[in-house]
């Protein structure tokens, strides 16, 4: 087995799927670790092509020899909730001004999507996490 490469950096970014380019914030974040920026952009765009229109978080591990690996995550819960509720952004005062509604079924659907990234044992627990996020954004959860 090949010897382990030494990790020199871990970069977390949230980038539009299929739309990574060397402009800020991607260029400076990768440049300071000496990563080939265009190589990352091409690999990321190819990996997220099917999810266009979503924001996809990515965790980039940079090694001593300036090579890298990356892992894409599921879109942020807040983004999925906004899309399902049909609102542009959450409420500035979530406990007084409500901006939209979600059904329990929509919560479970989002929970199903986010399941691999959530710290929950089953879909019901994951749906409660999603419902809590929605409430803190000023979106009412029915059911």
UniProtKB/Swiss-Prot annotation:
Belongs to the universal ribosomal protein uL11 family. Signal peptide: none annotated. The keyword Zinc does not apply. Forms part of the ribosomal stalk which helps the ribosome interact with GTP-bound translation factors. Coiled coil: none annotated. One of its GO terms (cellular component) is cytosolic large ribosomal subunit. One of its GO terms (biological process) is translation. The gene is rplK. This is Large ribosomal subunit protein uL11. Keywords: Methylation, Ribonucleoprotein, Ribosomal protein, RNA-binding, rRNA-binding. PANTHER family: 60S RIBOSOMAL PROTEIN L12, LARGE RIBOSOMAL SUBUNIT PROTEIN UL11M. GO terms for molecular function: large ribosomal subunit rRNA binding; structural constituent of ribosome. One or more lysine residues are methylated. The keyword Membrane does not apply. Part of the ribosomal stalk of the 50S ribosomal subunit. Interacts with L10 and the large rRNA to form the base of the stalk. L10 forms an elongated spine to which L12 dimers bind in a sequential fashion forming a multimeric L10(L12)X complex. Gene3D superfamilies: Ribosomal protein L11, C-terminal domain (1.10.10.250), Ribosomal protein L11/L12, N-terminal domain (3.30.1550.10). HAMAP family: Ribosomal_uL11. It comes from Micrococcus luteus (strain ATCC 4698 / DSM 20030 / JCM 1464 / CCM 169 / CCUG 5858 / IAM 1056 / NBRC 3333 / NCIMB 9278 / NCTC 2665 / VKM Ac-2230) (Micrococcus lysodeikticus).
């Amino acid at each position: 087995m090949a010897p382990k490469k030494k990790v020199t950096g871990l970069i977390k970014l949230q980038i539009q799927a299929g739309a990574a380019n060397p402009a800020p914030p991607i260029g400076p974040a990768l440049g300071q670790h000496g990563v080939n920026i265009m190589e990352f952009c091409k690999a990321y765009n190819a990996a997220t092509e099917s999810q266009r229109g979503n924001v996809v978080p990515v965790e980039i591990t940079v090694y001593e020899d300036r090579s890298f690996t990356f892992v894409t995550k599921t879109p942020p819960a807040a983004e999925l909730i906004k899309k399902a509720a049909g609102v542009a952004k959450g409420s500035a005062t979530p406990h007084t001004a409500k901006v939209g509604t979600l059904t329990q079924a929509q919560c479970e659907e989002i929970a199903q999507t986010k399941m691999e990234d959530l710290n929950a044992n089953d879909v019901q627990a994951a749906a409660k996490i999603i419902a809590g996020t929605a409430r803190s954004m000023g979106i009412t959860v029915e059911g």
